[in-house]
Design a protein with these regions (language model features):
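Membrane-embedded segments
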Residues: 15-105
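Conserved beta-sheet core of the metallophosphoesterase superfamily
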Residues: 136, 141-219
């Protein structure tokens, strides 16, 4: 499924009005057709100007790096790709191999804490003074939305929640990692105090091998100058 959203802001330059960003999240080594041909065909049909990958391309329980690498190699033929890792990449043994050779203009090491929220706060503090334009953040974790809002991020792309795994009519998602039962941020667009966050339901599964009322999705955001 392709889910499309329009995100408007007066900070979006006129030259970027209509810019399309396609998001893939939480692949978890899933394959849709041989070498993910079906997924890539659907991705290309969205006519993205760029593609963002928001973590967990692999699954730490059944890691197959080749599936993730192959998908990335084909995705960059469609449009420029920007990638942020998720908790499953961080847990598997080949993580250093995946990072090797990645060109990152602002790579940080030596974090002041082992707590994810404190590391994230420290990182946001490092970059918050570097931009006065429209600030787009890729973060695997949607549960830190209040922190993103505190730092004035304009648009966040997140995943991790798997759409709440089992979606109940009139209720929404049943549970999500990092948020527990009846998660607050599990699907779609959230906007508060000038910060918008798009949470993808993702395309793959991890601990639970199936979904209920919760189709895998490619999320597309079209930026508009307000």
């Amino acid at each position: 499924q392709v889910s499309e959203f329009v995100v408007s802001s007066e900070k979006v330059p006129e030259s970027f009005s209509g810019y399309r960003i396609a998001q893939i999240s939480d692949l978890h080594n899933a394959q849709f057709g041989e070498d993910n041909a079906q997924l890539l065909e659907l991705l290309e049909s969205t006519h993205p100007d760029c593609i963002v990958l928001t973590g967990d391309l692999v699954d730490s329980r059944r890691t197959d790096v080749e599936v993730a690498v192959s998908f990335g190699e084909e995705a960059v033929k469609i449009a420029p790709v920007y990638y942020v890792s998720g908790n499953h990449e961080a847990r598997f043994t080949e993580y250093e191999e995946v990072k090797a050779g990645v060109s990152d203009p602002s790579f940080q090491t030596g974090f002041p804490s082992d707590e994810p929220e404190e590391v994230l706060r420290w990182e946001l503090d490092q970059v918050s003074s570097e931009t006065d334009g429209y600030w787009i953040l890729l973060s695997h974790r949607p549960e830190y939305f209040e922190l993103y809002r505190e730092f004035g991020v304009d648009l966040v792309f997140a995943g991790h929640a798997h759409g709440g795994q089992f979606r109940l009519p009139f209720v929404g998602g049943l549970m999500a990692p990092g948020q527990g039962f009846f998660p607050k941020y599990d699907d779609g667009l959230y906007t508060e105090a000038g910060t918008s966050m798009l949470v993808s339901r993702g395309v793959g599964n991890s601990l639970f091998p199936f979904r209920v009322n919760n189709r895998p999705e490619i999320l597309v955001a079209e930026l508009r100058s307000a």
